[in-house]
Amino acid sequence: VPDILKQSDGNLIEVGTTNRTHLSDYEKAILDKDNCAALILRAHHSNFRIVGFTTEPTLIELVALGHEHGLPVVDDLGSGALLETTSYGLGHEPTVQESLSAGADVVCFSGDKLLGGPQAGLVVGRAAVLTELKRHPLARTIRADKLCLSALSATLMHYLKDEAVQKIP
């Protein structure tokens, strides 16, 4: 994400500290006139854990804050589970559905990894925001090709038929 922001002339505004971030840290960054915040990004820490004296705002709190200030909220889930992982003896991973239900405007996740489909970056969310993304001149250069879309469609069909666990390796 930092490299993408650098290439796009975006500015990543870090808030809080490694183990303690409060909603007020986000609000201070939003209200700082030097920052020009354009969105709130929450990135799920899927491959590490911070334990001990920690705190961070919930996605619901971030969505309320973002919308209060007219900012879209992007939730980058990384792996992107569609099924509850605790049912399989794993720790809880936030699902795409949970992020959307919490009100995130955009949810980003992988097509492979936990989903079990082709390697791809997937973006779901509010139609108005996705329409804006599609209109961007670079959207054409990063869209999925027909083969990738076909494989993704087949994978998602297993989820719709409630057979993903049996059919996806």
Residue ranges of model-derived segments:
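Conserved PLP-enzyme active-site core in the AAT-like
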Residues: 1-159
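Structural signature of PLP-dependent enzymes
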Residues: 159-169
